[in-house]
Amino acid sequence: MKAGIHPEYKAVNATCSCGNSFVFNSTLDKESIHLDVCDKCHPFYTGKQRIVDTGGRVDRFNKRFGALSSGKK
């Protein structure tokens, strides 16, 4: 293989919004990243029913189509 063409492989610290943090190896240029959900707080892994709303998408949907589900016209 050619020398000097491969990206640097280093440790990256990932921090979740729930407070969980872990280190993994990656070719990212950043030393740390922030996550919205991880395996400790994701509804699929915890078994708890929870809506993960990023950017108000659920509110926007309910504002546009909420009248249809409530029977109002």
From Swiss-Prot:
Family recorded in the similarity comment: Belongs to the bacterial ribosomal protein bL31 family. Type A subfamily.
One Gene Ontology biological process: translation
Required cofactor(s): Zn(2+)
Function: Binds the 23S rRNA.
InterPro entries from the UniProt entry: Ribosomal_bL28/bL31-like_sf, Ribosomal_bL31, Ribosomal_bL31_A, Ribosomal_bL31_sf
PANTHER family the record matches: 50S RIBOSOMAL PROTEIN L31, CHLOROPLASTIC, LARGE RIBOSOMAL SUBUNIT PROTEIN BL31A
Keywords: Metal-binding, Ribonucleoprotein, Ribosomal protein, RNA-binding, rRNA-binding, Zinc
PROSITE patterns in alphabetical order: RIBOSOMAL_L31
GO molecular function: metal ion binding; rRNA binding; structural constituent of ribosome
Quaternary structure note: Part of the 50S ribosomal subunit.
NCBIfam families: L31, PRK00019.1, PRK00528.1
UniProt remark on cofactor binding: Binds 1 zinc ion per subunit.
Binding site for Zn(2+): 16, 18, 38, 41
Pfam families found in the cross-reference section: Ribosomal_L31
Protein name according to UniProt: Large ribosomal subunit protein bL31
GO cellular component term of the entry, any: ribosome
